[in-house]
Amino acid sequence: SMLKFESVETNCNELGIEKNKVIAYWKDFDHIFRNRALDSLEERRIRKIYEYRMDSAPYEWGVKPVPKIESAEKLLKKIIQDKSSLCRFGDGEFEIMRGHIRPWFQSVSETLKDRLIEVLNSYEEFINIAVAQNFVDLDKFKERDADIIRAYMAYDTRKDIINFLDMKRTYYDAYVTRPYILYKNKRNAERLFPLFKKIWKDRSVIIVEGKYGRIGIKNDLFDASKSIKRVICPPRDAWMFYEKIKQTVIDIACRNDLICISLGPTATVLAYDLAKIGYQAIDIGQVDNEYDWYCMGADKRTSIKGKMVAEIKENNELEDFIDSKYFSQIAAEIY
């Protein structure tokens, strides 16, 4: 054993044998016992990271053209001022538009694809179109998250997304609903969460969410709202129930209500359709999960008791959920 061999080395030393004369066949001078396969995989992973960084660099440095995307803070201040609506396009929406499967909770659909393209190409003064800022200023994100974004945007993805966009148009940042977990520091969250709260302060709010969303429960995100009604939708493939969801919201909502939607790519289309007929509708994405993580001081995505977190495989106690306030707010359930 190595232990016994080390004692032999000690004996040799005591006998006055020079150290450089002792050949230690079982001593790992050159790391001969390391797992070469794992080393090779790690080297390949690191090489890929730098490959993606080099691929992204011309866009991040302004050498190649990128879409104009205004800040999340500017977007929220605009919504507060003019009560406009919001449709968001992140990786899930763009992947469906490319005919790919991305979000596990929504199957690919040609009708959804066509509607998303319609919304992205629309020009309505009272509807803000937001696109994920995956092109520049990635240094504000944690290194690992920035590298994940670069890896996603590599090869044909960036080109395909740019081809969907109007390079003469001004968009807003779809990461507005992701103000915390991606960022290196909390300053972004400290600016944006109060602005979200101002949007629904003293407003009658209708929350359209998946079965396990439970937005605003066990936190104070919506405490400043005047009232809350909830439309509970299927936790997956909400698009299959789109017309029923839309009609249910219309039946429940009053004209001055604020409609907040967290329903994956379906939310993008629903916010657009409701805004077109006179409602203020906002795709709030996963801002509630982000707020919970912010309140926890979490440094990575983690499960939230009683709530579905899309990126977490193990979600805690989804079925054994009891909250009288939440159940009293449910105006309709769609299954």
PLM feature spans:
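Electropositive, gly/pro-rich neighborhoods at or near active sites that engage anionic ligands
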Residues: 3-222
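A short, acidic, amphipathic alpha-helical segment used as a generic capping/interface helix at domain edges
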Residues: 70-72, 111-118, 241-252, 266
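Residues at the C-termini of beta-strands that transition into short coil/loop
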Residues: 133, 232-234, 285
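Residue-level detector of flexible, active-site-proximal loop/helix-junction positions
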Residues: 136, 235-237, 288
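Residues at the starts of beta-strands that form the adenosine-phosphate
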Residues: 204, 227, 280
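A mid-sequence, solvent-exposed acidic-amphipathic segment
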Residues: 211-256
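Short catalytic-loop micro-motif centered on adjacent basic/acidic residues
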Residues: 258-261
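C-terminal functional extensions of proteins
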Residues: 266-335
